[in-house]
Amino acid sequence: MHKLTHRFGLTLFVLLSLYFVSRRFNVDNAEEISTKAFIKPFISYAPSFFTAPDNKLIACEISKSMSQLTLNLMCLLYNETQYLADNNSFSDTWATSNRSCTKEFNFLNPSEVLKIDKNTVRFAFVRDPFRRFVSLYLNKCVNKNECYDCGSDMRCVVEKIYNSFYDIQNSRNETLKIGHIEAHAAPVTWNCNFHQGIEKWELLAMGSDTEERVSSAARLADILRKQGVRGSLVEKIHKNILTAETAHSTHKSSNRYEAERQVREDPFVRGYLHKIYLFDYLVFPFDRRVLDTAYQKIDSKLFLEEVAK
């Protein structure tokens, strides 16, 4: 369970979100859309960080967005000697590995010195929200039957996730607990203390597409070199990112085709997914072509300019 904290930063992104929530807007060739039912961005719930102080790196773990890769990578950078002694690998999961790094306070908690150092680099892997939901659904609902009492009923899952988030965002209970499924399904904007400033972060788009994976692996390699990671280790990390698979990876699952089809074609499921993840598509540079036409045409920059007036 994760402790929820309601903290809305004073960034323009947050002002944008409040603007959306408080009004209705028109979209060309579409009916007027009410935003009151949409899940708000920038609600922070116990964000998870990993550090490599020697290289002045902070990584944020976002569930179902290469979180195991993030942990394995940062464990290696935190203490390479221990990583090798523990026989860890980039294919490790929570269930298959004993990682010494996760017992280290300094690994899990960035120091104030590290946070304020102008040379510290923060990075996070981000993933298309609809694809991220499919990964969650296959892993937690289909394979493990952990999604409420829904089983593999996707309509049931999206409705219950939405209702949970709606209650959470409107709660004034500072000690409210966010559940296991909600933690994995939470909008990207709810992670990493993004309300304190997205501009602080290097965001690496990562999914199952080879082109996307190659591009982000190259960007990460550049970051690591800049932060003083030796060349041979950078090459090892780069290779592992391109080839490693974790035990609970779902992008080659036999059930994925049907899950993706339902996300594309079922209006009930799509309706809830838009309500949950619209702000992720407005705030981050995800490809909006997966959205319904009306939502593709929303000009987030225009609304940001109006709020800033």
What are these regions (language model features)?
Residues 2-309:
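Membrane-interface amphipathic segments in extracytoplasmic regions
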